[in-house]
Amino acid sequence: MTIHVKNNIHWVGQRDWEVQDFHGTEYKMTKGTSYNSYLIREEKTVLIDTVDHRFSQQFIQNLQMEIDLQSIDFIVINHAEEDHSGALSALMEKIPNTPIYCTEAAIDSIVGHHHHPEWNFKTVKTGDSIDIGNGKQLVFVEAPMLHWPDSMMTYLTGDAVLFSNDAFGQHYCDERLFNDEVDQAELMEQCLRYYSNILTPFSALVTAKIQEVLSFNLPVDMIATSHGIVWRENPTQIIEQYLAWANNYQEDRITIFYDSMSNNTRMMADAIAQGIHDVDPSVAVKVFNVSKQDKNEILANVFRSKGILVGSSTMNNVMMPKIAGMLEEITGLRFKAKKAAAFGSYGWNGGAVDRIHARLTDAGFETAISLKTKWRPDGKAMRECREHGQQIAKLWAVKDKSTLSTPVNAFQSATPIEGIEAQQPLTETTPTADAAHSADCQCMVCTVCNWVYDPAKGEPNQGIEVGTTWADVPDYFLCPECHLGKDVFVEYQG
């Protein structure tokens, strides 16, 4: 089955209505997903990406019904993850000498997944292009850490279609392919869920990459993603939304999540929520039990919130395991400009609350006062919990509501972003490293995201003191922006 996208572009992907888990079991899919592959037939025939490996044979059968596989002139792999390149091994068995265009980093990951170093790889970088005939070119734009080091986007001139890889996508399955055909509230929900759970750690890179693409002043008539719908009507609305999400996004919202052995901490959570509402009824307050509710929905609400409260019973003087796991995920997602507080019940001592407070502080949250209740909360303790909620509401009140993000419940037609207008040739550009560094500063720059390590500043968040030379930086060091190791750094040349 194929779906006509535009002119000589067809969707040849695979819908997956039944899938529930992604990245192991870390991401729960509530609406299925699609693995989007695109066939372009100009004077040259090009296949962009494949599908998940579980659908390899079905994908090839469908493709053979559409074209002679031998007519494929080359394959573009925007990303090597198995849900993008999974059918590549089966396809290459039938057309083994077909060139594969990808980034240099993708060769390593493709070979690592498929174990075929003899394949005909062609390395591309930002600004490289291929003439596919009829006056059209494919132009490549590297997008490292969105969300893998090997990621790139591909732009088709003439048709003005951006094959955006994982960016602007969503795990959302529908028989209809285009954004203007589906339920807009459902689409927004899945886009936000996808961004908040997968792309949040790379928000600074999202902004930089979007600004780089906008600087090319290319027309964008469609954005063809790797998962979910194709953005056909006002495609730049999702670009605008990504820029908003990447800019320390927060609504007038507070999220409370907890785990409880005997419902004591649940009682506290309910009373705290009531106290917040007493003081500021306009604040959206959501309460979640991490043992019973969707973890990814909780994380999406954390992303939307100006502050969170995390509660746990104390077990063996530590927090409940599911709360510990959630805090580990929150630390990895690197939320910015948010407040937090801990609460919980205990019998012998309240170690869980202290540990939660410490973890939230380490994760970069601005932490407020904690609250502990011994045994099952009685009337006095419940009043204290409600008063605590009232105090939190006052402490976290935003005087100027205009500084908060406006919740968007559905996509709507909007004015396209300025800057995506006339088509011009692409030239290679890279994000500019910190201009404050001199050429003789003995700095090191990350080749993936351009973050600069300066010995004069150190990296206090990883315990690296001011004055530490690169040779003395420990091997466990990770780039604060892209979280890759020392091996991706090179000497800064100014």
Curated annotation (Swiss-Prot):
Protein residues bound to Fe cation 3: C446, C449, C479, C482
* Limits of the Flavodoxin-like domain: 254-393
In which broad location class does this protein mainly occur, judging by the first location in its UniProt entry? cytoplasm
Compartments reported by the entry: Cytoplasm
Pathway involvement of the protein, from the record: Nitrogen metabolism; nitric oxide reduction
Gene3D superfamilies referenced in this protein's UniProt entry, alphabetically: 2.20.28.10, 3.40.50.360, Ribonuclease Z/Hydroxyacylglutathione hydrolase-like (3.60.15.10)
An MF annotation (GO) of this entry: iron ion binding
What's the protein name?
Anaerobic nitric oxide reductase flavorubredoxin
Q: What are the leading ranks of the lineage?
A: Bacteria, Pseudomonadati, Pseudomonadota, Gammaproteobacteria, Vibrionales
